[in-house]
Amino acid sequence: MGTSVQVTPLCGVYNENPLSYLVSIDGFNFLIDCGWNDLFDTSLLEPLSRVASTIDAVLLSHPDTLHIGALPYAMKQLGLSAPVYATEPVHRLGLLTMYDQFLSRKQVSDFDLFTLDDIDSAFQNVIRLTYSQNYHLSGKGEGIVIAPHVAGHMLGGSIWRITKDGEDVIYAVDYNHRKERHLNGTVLQSFVRPAVLITDAYHALYTNQTARQQRDKEFLDTISKHLEVGGNVLLPVDTAGRVLELLLILEQHWSQRGFSFPIYFLTYVSSSTIDYVKSFLEWMSDSISKSFETSRDNAFLLRHVTLLINKTDLDNAPPGPKVVLASMASLEAGFAREIFVEWANDPRNLVLFTETGQFGTLARMLQSAPPPKFVKVTMSKRVPLAGEELIAYEEEQNRLKREEALRASLVKEEETKASHGSDDNSSEPMIIDTKTTHDVIGSHGPAYKDILIDGFVPPSSSVAPMFPYYDNTSEWDDFGEIINPDDYVIKDEDMDRGAMHNGGDVDGRLDEATASLMLDTRPSKVMSNELIVTVSCSLVKMDYEGRSDGRSIKSMIAHVSPLKLVLVHAIAEATEHLKQHCLNNICPHVYAPQIEETVDVTSDLCAYKVQLSEKLMSNVIFKKLGDSEVAWVDSEVGKTERDMRSLLPMPGAASPHKPVLVGDLKIADFKQFLSSKGVQVEFAGGGALRCGEYVTLRKVGPTGQKGGASGPQQILIEGPLCEDYYKIRDYLYSQFYLL
């Protein structure tokens, strides 16, 4: 049998809930994604709580709450202690996302599910990988290799490939085949025939995706129209994910049009977010990387966007029309919720949603058709304690401090007794004479005598009072005192300034003291009141989610052509639609498990380990194929002297084989290649490529619905045997490796 693979959804199947899946490979348990929603519903984590202690490794795919939101809570409360793997941007931006969530919640509630320290603890030991980096696990995971690949949805977002004994398990959710301003498209189509593909059906029913140029024009025209009539524009956004694409669109448009309307990016960590993003250019699109290499122009040096970390700065901004991108996208908390309540009753204003709101949130309610004219909103804020409440609070705090001091003194006394009891050579403690005599009091009278408290008996171990003395011993060697090189390291001034400006340390972490500067730490309580908000402003939703549409999903799954397919994360209708399509056109083994339902997707193929004998390899001729080398081998299975299964040379002359062309030709790329060679080329009907006057190329083979390939493809050259025919054929052969 092949590698044993079982998949168990813990959250996020047959609905739009957060993503969390248990994948077991030969007994090694991966938790892939550990998401939560903006409602922080603990009931969603019950399946995870039952298996958290058995997890051996955690893989994170994207830096948003739906993929990483439950990680701090799971590590603090559920017993999750496995190592975590992610790309550098997912680690850094995910950390900032959780900071923003915590600070937003703490401002309006007594949020206690996790703290800043819990967030730091969860992220401090994340093992960071680069794209396509093969990381070999050890110990229980010996023989398993993991590697992140470009997903195209968010900065650093990953498709995970897990390999064991030559079989691939691909986890690909929330991917985007389209190239965007700051991201390249996914590389999912580069995988062929994996043993298992785990993917989502989120957009399986969405097929009318607008062209990027037209979408951007509608987006900018809608914003401009409301600004020009004196209205404000609110874009509820995530903390550090899809908002980056929106910032670039606005920045470039403002530069081209010369607009004077201010743009504000308002989150608790906006400055930190942009500072980190500036250093992640190698993770972005080719155009951004090339622009920086040639002109040193960083696309995220935002000249038209002002970064804010508190709403007071926005309130103090000059009056007039403005664009504000504020978190959270769900409108359940954060600055966006406050701004919506303030701006909703003005018909000149616009609330522009760029993604579908999470189920059960205010954003989802406002996106319904038709939108509501009134919404009931519970607004909460912290108010300082006063009067009797403040006195009671201070008394309680003083009582707690006294109890803590008493506990500390008792512990110290026990330690002192233990230290004296264990030191046989220690001198006897000096006894304090507690007798109060008239000579001591002297002429000061009874007033001084009353200072002494009756019943006070010094401990038997009391000693004469002394100033504390600490002996700081230093280590020496033959050359003198040993120095610590870390004491002389000069920190990067830019990082220091950035950290201080952003409210964190040089690693981007926030501590409780820094958080206290962002939050009012005076004694306070949460006051809540329900408001009926009149929704007179315009409500518009546009698709900037950065996900492939249904047609592209089907085409890519057909191209990948997995042996077994597992569908997750979509409503029931979309899941069943994609499942039936794949069963009919792509793969006979398609699974869509329920929560905590384990499906066994072990490969039906048998895998064996064999040794390549020296006799065989001495006659093999390799040919370069990208970063690898390939060769055709004729051999038979036998055993060497060490009784190991090996591939041995054939006893006689090997029979000739037909030439094999290795490679994957894209007709669009080949068209550009022929054009560079001076060949007149154009697309004809049915996807054919007309080359010159007489020759036509076309791909043929099994196809699925809407043209998606579902099997091996062939390339046909049609035309008379002429000079152009042979020239085009040679150009075609040059695109492959011949074995």
UniProtKB/Swiss-Prot annotation:
Matching InterPro entries: Beta_Casp (IPR022712), CPSF2 (IPR027075), Cpsf2_C (IPR025069), CPSF2_MBL (IPR035639), Metallo-B-lactamas (IPR001279), RibonucZ/Hydroxyglut_hydro (IPR036866), RMMBL (IPR011108)
Protein name listed in UniProt: Cleavage and polyadenylation specificity factor subunit 2
Effect of disrupting the coding gene: Impaired antisense-RNA-mediated gene silencing. Early flowering.
Family per record: Belongs to the metallo-beta-lactamase superfamily. RNA-metabolizing metallo-beta-lactamase-like family. CPSF2/YSH1 subfamily.
Biological processes, Gene Ontology terms: mRNA 3'-end processing by stem-loop binding and cleavage; regulatory ncRNA-mediated post-transcriptional gene silencing
Positions of the UniProt region annotated as Disordered: 411-430
Function, in words: CPSF plays a key role in pre-mRNA 3'-end formation, recognizing the AAUAAA signal sequence and interacting with poly(A)polymerase and other factors to bring about cleavage and poly(A) addition. Required for antisense-RNA-mediated gene silencing.
GO molecular function: RNA binding
Broad class of where this protein is predominantly found: nucleus
Assigned keywords, A-Z: Cytoplasm, mRNA processing, Nucleus, RNA-binding
Cellular localisation: Nucleus; Cytoplasm
